Each structure stands twice: as structure tokens, then as C-alpha cells.
Amino acid sequence: MSTFHIETSIGSTDPAVVIAALHNHELMIKTLCPALVSYAFESGDKATSAVYTVTDKKPIGQTTFKLTLTNTPGGVDSLVNAKPPVGILTIAATWRVADGKLTEDVVIDGNFMMKKVAKGNVEKTHPEQHTKLLEAARA
């Protein structure tokens, strides 16, 4: 397993506003998947915990995966269950707002190749996703 910790200052933004943005599943999906092709609600309750099928564009084709978003008092938990051609990939993250920061703790599990690809993607895109999410929360 690979783990990562990412944090971004929320500045003067009210923490409740940032938490509300995290609880907005449509906003989270659009923020987490910048190359989003489509998504569909599968099951659960969008106000608490829901499963979505997400299709994302990749450099070569598209990938479809299950995304579970679970609202918590301080943020949201996300769980990606993907089945790419070369194995299974699970990305679990906790997004929390506390002490003037948006923090994300990520755990990636899969075979060596999938972990390496996912790790590079998380390191490259997630700080940018924090910024976009905070911009949307402030809008």
C-alpha cells in the first residue's frame, strides 16, 4: 500500500462552507475527475453515502469505476474501486477540514504497476483538486 498526505490552507473561508462543498457529491465528482466523461448515481443516499459509476477519459481511451462518497461531520470519505485491464486498484481517501486546512489522506492499493501510476496521478493532480474545490466553495 502507498499512503499520501496532502493539505491546503483554507485561508479565511468558513470551514462550514468548505465542508458543504465536500458534501456536494456532484462538485466532488467534477473536481476529482477533471477529464470526466459521465457519471451516474447507483445506490445509497446522496445526502449521506452514495455509490456512483464514473467514466473518465484517459490518455488512451476511457476508464469506468465505482466511486463511493460518504459524508462525515468534518468532511467526506471517498473510495475508488477500479478494475483496469492490468489488475484491481483501490484508492481510499479521507478529506477533512480542521485547523484552517483542507487535508486529504490517501491510501492506494493494487499491484505494483497500478500503484505506481496512481501514485503519480495523486501527487500531480490532488493539490490542484484542493485548489479547485476551495475556489468552488468560495464562489
Regions found by a protein language model. Give the residues of each.
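Hydrophobic ligand-binding cavity/cleft-lining segments
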Residues: 1-49
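Intrinsically disordered, low-complexity acidic/polar segments
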Residues: 17, 61, 111-115
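Residues that form generic nucleotide/phosphate-binding pockets
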Residues: 21, 125, 136
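A very general structural signal that marks isolated residues within well-ordered alpha-helical segments
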Residues: 23-24, 110, 135
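Short, low-complexity, polar/charged sequence segments that are solvent-exposed and flexible
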Residues: 25-29, 40, 71-75, 99, ...
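Hydrophobic-cavity lipid-handling domains and compact docking modules
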Residues: 38-39, 43-91, 95-97
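Beta-strand/loop substructures that line and gate deep hydrophobic ligand-binding cavities in soluble
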Residues: 77-128
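Short, highly charged C-terminal tails/helix-capping segments
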Residues: 131-139
